[in-house]
Amino acid sequence: MPFVELETNLPASRIPAGLENRLCAATATILDKPEDRVSVTIRPGMTLLMNKSTEPCAHLLVSSIGVVGTAEQNRTHSASFFKFLTEELSLDQDRIVIRFFPLEAWQIGKKGTVMTFL
């Protein structure tokens, strides 16, 4: 059950229409998870400073069970997410940062319980 959160200082007017759907599909492909299990949040218009600059930038937070826990996995994921984000948001790679958070099944609540018991 991947969670993807895109935070950017780009105004909402610069976020391409349908980005949430394309990011969901890309995440499912990149992490090899079913698309109907991916949760996407996009937060435009945030106040962000990166490398001492407020020029357009983005932070991507990727959390999931079992697929973001090693450097080898995340190197591959990173390359794919960077390709997607640079194309979709027209940002240079040095204006994007990705953070990966491995989750355990007991850390995600669903249907009145946690994923461990589903």
Curated annotation (Swiss-Prot):
List residues modified as Phosphoserine.
S90
Which EC number(s) are documented for this chain?
4.1.1.84
Its keywords, alphabetically, are: Acetylation, Cytoplasm, Lyase, Melanin biosynthesis, Phosphoprotein
Q: Name one GO cellular component term.
A: cytoplasm
Q: Where in the cell is it found?
A: Cytoplasm
Q: What is this protein called?
A: D-dopachrome decarboxylase
Enzyme class at the top of the EC tree = lyase
Q: Which SUPFAM superfamilies match?
A: Tautomerase/MIF (SSF55331)
- Report the superkingdom from the record: Eukaryota
Modified residues annotated as N6-acetyllysine in this record: K33
Organism equals Mus musculus
